[in-house]
Curated annotation (Swiss-Prot):
The gene coding this protein: luxS
GO MF term list: iron ion binding; S-ribosylhomocysteine lyase activity
InterPro entries: LuxS_sf, Metalloenz_LuxS/M16, S-ribosylhomocysteinase
Subunit relationships: Homodimer.
Known cofactor(s): Fe cation
Spans traversing the lipid bilayer: none
Record text on cofactor binding: Binds 1 Fe cation per subunit.
Family stated for the protein in its record: Belongs to the LuxS family.
GO process terms (BP): quorum sensing
Keywords: Autoinducer synthesis, Iron, Lyase, Metal-binding, Quorum sensing
Protein name (database record): S-ribosylhomocysteine lyase
NCBIfam families associated with the record: PRK02260.1-2
Keyword Iron: yes
Length: 169
């Protein structure tokens, strides 16, 4: 099985909260696609609560679009990582890590402005596979933690696993 890009970086050296360009690629027509690793938690040390990450999934996707989409950037998808330490964001365009960090912090501020759980988008059995597994309180706690810590940048060159280490794994 081919080694996926996300497994060629050293998770023991990742900072969090931090943004990282996980992948650049182009469509056959030449459109740039960028995948970002939005790392909320330090891998293997912290984890996002399942209710909190699920509520963030519903809120974060819309709020990030509000702050990052433009004439040359369009978010395709924002999905939680299976390890529950962050989200992957795929988009058309090539915003800088700084632009993404600014949008991320603004989106976290928006999460704090949500007053009631009933304001969470698509919170019903028709549009959500586990619509009862949500917590606005936990999502807002995550948002407060991100705002308090700030968002840094993880660079692939700093995190690259050596061929020697990869050969031993």
């Amino acid at each position: 099985m081919p080694l996926l890009d996300s497994f060629t970086v050293d998770h023991t050296r990742m900072n969090a909260p931090a943004v990282r360009v996980a992948k650049h690629m182009s469509t056959p027509k030449g459109d740039a696609i960028t995948v970002f690793d939005l790392r909320f938690c330090t891998p293997n040390k912290e984890i996002l609560s399942e209710r909190g990450i699920h509520t963030l999934e519903h809120l974060f996707a819309g709020f990030m679009r509000d702050h990052l989409n433009s004439s040359n950037v369009e978010i395709i998808d924002i999905s939680p990582m299976g390890c529950r330490t962050g989200f992957y964001m795929s988009l058309i365009g090539e915003p800088t890590e700084h632009q993404v960090a600014v949008a991320w912090l603004a989106a976290m501020e928006d999460v704090l402005k949500v007053v009631e759980q009933s304001e969470i988008p698509e919170l019903n059995e028709y549009q959500c596979g586990t619509y009862e597994m949500h917590s606005l309180e936990q999502a807002q706690e995550i948002a407060r933690n991100i705002i308090a810590a700030g968002v840094s940048v993880n660079r692939n060159d700093d995190l690259k696993l050596s061929d020697e280490i990869l050969g031993k794994l």
